[in-house]
Amino acid sequence: MPNLQLILKTILITELLILALSALMTMLPPILNKLTWDPEKAMTTTFRLSLTSILIHILIEEPSSISSLYSPTMLNLAMSIKIDYYSLIFISIALFITRAILQYTKWYMASDRDLKKFSMFLLLFLMSMIMFIAANNFFPMLVGWGTMGLMSYLLISWWHGRTEATTSGLQAILYNRLADIGFILTFSWCITYMSSLDLNTFFATSTLVTGVPILGMLMAAMGKSAQFGMHPWLPAAMEGPTPVSALLHSSTMVTAGVYLLIGMHPILSQTQGFSEACLTMGAATALYASFKALLQNDLKKIIAFSTLSQLGFMMATVGLNHPNLAFMHLCMHAFFKAMMFLCAGSISHALFGEQDIRKMSGMIKVTPITASCFTLSTLALAGFPFLTGFFSKDLIIETILLSKINMLWATMLLISTMFTAIYSLRMTLRILTGTPWYNDLLTYEENPTCTKPIMKLALASIVTGSLFSLFTPPIYTPLQTMPPTIKLAALTLTFMSAFLAMYLISLANNKPLPKNTIQNHMLQTAKDLKIITHRHLMAKLLKASQKTALQILDNHWKLKAGPKYIEKTQIPMSMKTSTQSGLIKTYFMAFLVTFVIILYIMLFY
């Protein structure tokens, strides 16, 4: 019988080599185009290999396996691969979504002269995520973690001629540097107290792990997954091209923080206060983001805040000590969120770059395929039955209501679920119904290069939910006495929110609100939160640093060039004069002899 673990390791290494080779070939000169390997074909090959690895893993009785590639003696910086349920499933999903995005990029970025370079950056972005997922050592995890932050800056600020894009890229990398501080804190603790960076050693010595590495991982996840307080960079990242937004929000960087906590959950769950911290962060993020999405009119900003809200749900689920359920929602969210962004980019392209949903209507008549897929994605986001979002959100709400957590957290998450259904329906009705604003749109034709990847993601958004519900490991033992009201809670919230949204939209259309509306006040309040983190806090830090700098300057003038300096220069002279013995006869005789000699020289010479 062949060594199946060795085959799995070989397949994973082959996938990385194929991606790296394809990325390098994109930089070959045009004269060597025949030698280049199309990134889309490379993604197809790697995706098929990943499916093969999943089938092989099912045949192995062990839940996970570790394979070492390189084992130096210093600090145990082993390049080892972790092959388990989480890594194999998520790598396959990331490859499938990236392949669809690369196909979409050919149409969306067709006029960009650096299309090959852009594709290479997308591949490197994916490779860094795969390295982070598959690593069984903190060192390669740190390399993948940091590379994701760097690639996010390069991709978000791709249109560097625009000030907003450059500023958003800098904002993203600065917030990610804060997350890196947390990861490096855990990294340094492992070197100092364990003399090893191996994850198996870290888990084996769980009783010795203090609050420092736990705090570092929480800080890292909070920054990378844009939790409340460190969230402003995620909506700002919408200034990048649509393929970047789709890949960033679905299967790469923003999911890395939650994935870190899922992978480290066996040791994190033993720490007192960890569950409460995750629940607080997740509930606050979900409620704030869903509330903010209600007030937005920019299409991509609404989708960005919806991602933020779902990340809060995942974080709260980790806090409920259900990592499998959080991972399931992470995977389900990836499909419909990538499809939603690609549809938004297609709709905006058809409207000559317009992103304000108040200026969109009747797109179902203009782009029927894209509009239908967009409707499917919004329904999946709202948790409509038998779509991907339903299978995970229904279980999350059911788990929340059956758990013994504080009802404040449960209420915040349930209100966030209602808000999600409301802004999802608002987007759908605003964009798809009504009469098109532009007559030219009636002749618009959807490009197959654009619609094919969207339709593939739509099919995945329909099928994968039921597949996951069959093959996901058990989350908990089902309770036989579960009340029907709890079982139908998610479905009830979805339909209640839908009816409420339709009523509010009809009310707004029939009776427009005055200029000084509650919505404007709420928007201003939301902006003030960003001002606190970006203005007030920074102003106080600058004032404190300025005060310190002035104190240092004053001390310098006082000690180096002021009274202290004069005092220091006079002390040696005074010390020399104070060493005289006070013998007046001796001094007078020396003076007299010197005077006689000088007088003799002056008279006779």
Curated annotation (Swiss-Prot):
It comes from the Eukaryota. InterPro entries: NADH_DH_su5_C (IPR010934), ND/Mrp_TM (IPR001750), NU5C-like (IPR003945), Proton_antipo_N (IPR001516). It holds the Pfam family NADH5_C. The chain crosses the membrane at residues 11-31, 49-69, 77-97, 120-140, 141-161, 178-198, 202-222, 244-264, 273-295, 302-322, 325-345, 371-391, 408-425, 457-477, 488-508, 584-604. GO terms for cellular component: mitochondrial inner membrane. Belongs to the complex I subunit 5 family. PANTHER family: NADH-UBIQUINONE OXIDOREDUCTASE CHAIN 5 (PTHR42829:SF2). This is NADH-ubiquinone oxidoreductase chain 5. It comes from Pelomedusa subrufa (African side-necked turtle). The lineage of its organism: Eukaryota, Metazoa, Chordata, Craniata, Vertebrata.
